[in-house]
Amino acid sequence: MNHSDTLSLSLELLQQPSVTPIDHTCQTIMADRLAKVGFHIEPMRFGDVDNLWARRGTEGPVFCFAGHTDVVPTGRLDAWNSDPFAPEIRDGKLYGRGSADMKTALAAMVVASERFVAKHPNHKGSIAFLITSDEEGPAVNGTVKVIETLEKRNEKITWCLVGEPSSTHKLGDIVKNGRRGSLNAVLKVQGKQGHVAYPHLARNPIHEASPALAELCQTVWDNGNEYFPATSFQISNIHAGTGATNVIPGTLEVTFNFRYSTEVTAEQLKQRVHEILDKHGLQYEIVWNLSGLPFLTPVGELVNAAQTAILNVTGTETELSTSGGTSDGRFIAPTGAQVLELGVLNATIHQINEHVDVHDLDPLTDIYEQILENLLA
C-alpha cells in the first residue's frame, strides 16, 4: 500500500512513545524535515521539557503552526486492540496513541509547509512552528516558556494555527476561535474535631460549609455572550473525615473550578466567592490557581483564511466555537496573535483505541496548505 507523505510521517511520529514530558525524538524528526526546506531550527529545552521553535523568513507577518508532540498515558495495554505505539491501519482508520491528539496534525503541518515552500520559495512574511512536549502535563516548561523567550526578543506571531482536534462529525466542521478561562481553587474549611455523640463539643465543617457550597452551585455568574456560554462552576473533589464513623471531622477540603467567559474576570469571580463564604461565617483558607485566561479571535484574516480553505477542500461550511477545555492557545493569544484551533475529529482523544480516519489526513494537509496560500502567497 502506497502511503501519502502525511500518512508516512504520521506513522513515524506515532511510533515514538512520547508520553508527557518525553518528546522521544518527535521534534527532531519534524525539525530535520523543516531544515531541508529552509527553516532555522531552534530547540528550546526548559527543565525536562523539549520545545521547538522553527522559522523560515525574517520578516512579518508571521504565520505559526503550534502543537504538541506529547501524548497522554495509554491506560491498560490489554484493553487496546493493538499496541498503542505500533500504529495500525484497520478498516480505513489509523489506530495509535496520539493519532487524533495530535500527531497526524503535526505531520499535516510539516507536509503542507514543504509543499507551500516548494511553490512559493520567496513567500511573504515568515512561517514558524512552535512545538512542545508538555501540553498534556503541567504546561509549565512548554509553550508558555517559548512565548516568554520570543516576547523578550520582541519576536511576534501574527497568526497562529493550533492543530488540536477541533472537528466533531466531519473534518473542518468546527474551528475553535477561542477558549474559556479556567480558574481553580482549593478551599479548606476549619471546624473542630469531636465525637459524633457530642456534637455540642465539636464544629462540623461539612455541615457549616454545605449551605455555602449549595449557594455557589446555584449562583448564576453571568449569562455568557454570542461567543461564550455562561460561566460554569463545578466542584471536583470533597475530602473530610478520618474514615471512622464516630468522629466529626476537623477540616473539610473542597476543590472546584470555574470555566469562565469574557463577561467576568478571574478577580470578580474570586471576590464573589469570598463574599458568599464570608456571608456564611466560615473559617476558611482558599488557594487560587489561574490556569488560563479566556481568549477570542474575532472574524478577520485568520478566520476567513481558514473558513475559505475548509470550504474549498471539503465543501463544509465551518462553525466557530469556544467550547471544550483549555489548549496552549491560551499562552499565545495574550501576545496579540490571532489564534485558531483546527484539526481532525476529537471523538476518541485520550481514549483506549484512539484513532483517526485515514481519509482525513490528506484533506487536512490541503487545508493547512491553502491557509498558507491565503495568507502568505
UniProtKB/Swiss-Prot annotation:
CDD domains: M20_DapE_proteobac (cd03891). It is an enzyme of class 3 (hydrolase). Its EC number is 3.5.1.18. Keywords: Amino-acid biosynthesis, Cobalt, Diaminopimelate biosynthesis, Hydrolase, Lysine biosynthesis, Metal-binding, Zinc. It catalyses: N-succinyl-(2S,6S)-2,6-diaminopimelate + H2O = (2S,6S)-2,6-diaminopimelate + succinate. SUPFAM superfamilies: Bacterial exopeptidase dimerisation domain, Zn-dependent exopeptidases. This is Succinyl-diaminopimelate desuccinylase. It comes from Acinetobacter baumannii (strain SDF). The lineage of its organism: Bacteria, Pseudomonadati, Pseudomonadota, Gammaproteobacteria, Moraxellales.
